[in-house]
Amino acid sequence: MEQKCKIGGEGLRNRGLVNEEDRISELPEALLLLILSSLPTETVIATSVLSKQWKSLWKLVPNLKFDSKYHYHYTFSDNVFRSLISHKAPVLDSLHLKVEDKDDALDVGILIGIAFSRHMRKFVLKITLLEESFVRFPSAWCSCNDTLEILELKYCILLDFPSLVCLKSLRKLYLYHVRFNDEESVCNLLCGCPSLEDLVVHRHSTTDVESYTIAVPSLQRLTIYDDYYGEGVGGYVINAPSLKYLNIDGFNGLEFCLIEKAPELVEAKISAVFEIANENIMDSLTSAKCLSLHLAPFKIKYPTGKIFYQLLSLELRAYSYEWWNLLWFMLDSSPKLQILKLVDPYQFPKEDCSVGWEWSRPKCVPECLLFHLETFVWTRYEWQREDEKAVATYILKNARCLKKATLSTKPIGSEELEKLGKRREMLNELATQASPSNSCNLVFESE
């Protein structure tokens, strides 16, 4: 059974945990505070019995962490309240509250109010209730705040912002499976953060808000994970002109996903996105220099022409027998591509594939192969498949500037000598296919 540290328990000295030769107290106070900041506040408070010097030292610790499961029933709120009132540090750098009891959650609003009055810089609130009821976040404390820089909210929290918030210094906002009261609350929160740079959103339902609008001019990093498979209801509207990093994962069966172009975009990762009625995802990524795509080919719209003029690095994780089509589309659309990575792109047995699944040789060699591609990596290369062998051969033959190619295959046991021999024969044959115009370093690996 888990041993829990309870406030008001047996003293450390009485349990023989205090050495008569107290060397740790000789450390500089700044170092002691740094050490104590990494511990749960319940443990930090327990150190007050060590000596006269330690009696008030915990009150200066800038980072406080409380977990309701380490408190006796009905004592959590009182203990947190007393700790916040007794806190003497000039600034409260961070406060972590983890609440697992419905009764303790009732006083969260009061505790948050005290913390905000202490000029808090980082606040993490995690509420997990068995009844799956939601605790309303006190919006009044967000009406005018110029010290909070990081806000992280998790699970059973209801966000209701009837008017525009004013979080002038907020730079990072993390929302994990929280609920909004309405679409207006989303806009009032995000539009009231003029310094917001990093936004992370995890959702598994569109029942609270159908149109999730993210319009933040200052936003530089955006991550959205939505594992809800919808029925063509709801979606996202994203307008972030300063965006440099975009990560979208799990947009399945949404009604729409509309993204304004981000001219400063550097890197984007798009995974498990398909069957969206109205979307422009790929068209919004044309400024990216680095792309990672994990998609079922052509389940979303692909614009035509050489549109990825800035793209230098492409990682492709397709999971359909049609993935060749996506590969050639991206190569043909990215004339300056220098790095190509293929990762486990084939997960379907040949007998399950429809007619016409075989790879067909492109009519024209993509420009990036002729003039720019320098690095080619293929992870979990299926050397026994003729189609994959044909693709690898084509790239090696036509990539005139290729400097290094790495192909990794699944391991083969030493008892399968015949299979090992066939793989060695195939790899040796492949090694002869590299374009004679380059000095490519061809590497074969086994995972």
Swiss-Prot record:
What sequence ranges are listed for the domain FBD?
358-409
Record-level GO cellular component terms: nucleus
Domain F-box: where?
Answer: 21-84
Concerning SUPFAM superfamilies, the annotation shows: F-box domain, RNI-like
PROSITE patterns xrefs: FBOX
InterPro entries, sorted: F-box-like_dom_sf (IPR036047), F-box_dom (IPR001810), FBD (IPR006566), FBL13/AtMIF1-like (IPR050232), LRR_dom_sf (IPR032675), LRR_FXL15/At3g58940/PEG3-like (IPR055411)
**Per its UniProt entry, which superkingdom is the organism in?**
Eukaryota
- Residues of the signal sequence? none
What is any Pfam family matched here?
FBD
Cite the PANTHER family for this sequence.
Answer: EMB|CAB62440.1-RELATED (PTHR31900:SF34), F-BOX/RNI SUPERFAMILY PROTEIN-RELATED (PTHR31900)
Q: Report what the protein is called.
A: FBD-associated F-box protein At3g49020
List the source organism: Arabidopsis thaliana (Mouse-ear cress)
